[in-house]
Amino acid sequence: MYARSTTFEGMPANVEAGIAFVRNEAAPMLAKAEGCRGLSLLVDRATGQCIATSSWDTEAAMRAGDRELRPLRDRGRDILGGSLEMDEWEVAVMHRTSHGECCRVSWLQGDVEAMTETFRVGILPELEQTPGFCSASLLVNRATGLGCGTTVWESRAAMEASRVVADDLRRRTADEAAGEIVEVHEYELAYAHLHLPEMA
């Protein structure tokens, strides 16, 4: 399984219009794309930063759909009123127990194999014991050594309450991967229809 994420640095006042665009235009178009499993949208209403992620059965399917979907990304950028950056990933881990409202995204640089094993064997069991936890995923780019870990929580209160635990788990993952934490950001999960299978 593969994923493409597009990070929009938009205007806070345009976030609601961006959500409507994803729900009413982007999602229906992606539903017709061969090999596409779905779409999610994370938003930070305070900064205007939004991340749209599409999931794909194969790398070939993801690449094949790129030309057709490029105008869609450009339209999303215009609606949100900012810039965009695109990343492509392999889905290394996916585990879901229930749906949630908010998520925390952590970007780490390091040994991708060690990062994946630590996330699967050491991190997931502890997350499952944390109140309010709903799901977790790890996307990796083997060429760059970058990993993107996302945890989903049932509410903003649950996400905030998990920060101390999350900080410890994140540091442990970075240490095991002989790497570093690049960035951490919390978002509202505005649209969640990725339809990825269990990969834990």
Regions found by a protein language model. Give the residues of each.
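Short S/T/G/P-rich N-terminal loop/turn motif that feeds into the first structured element of a domain
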Residues: 1-51, 57-200
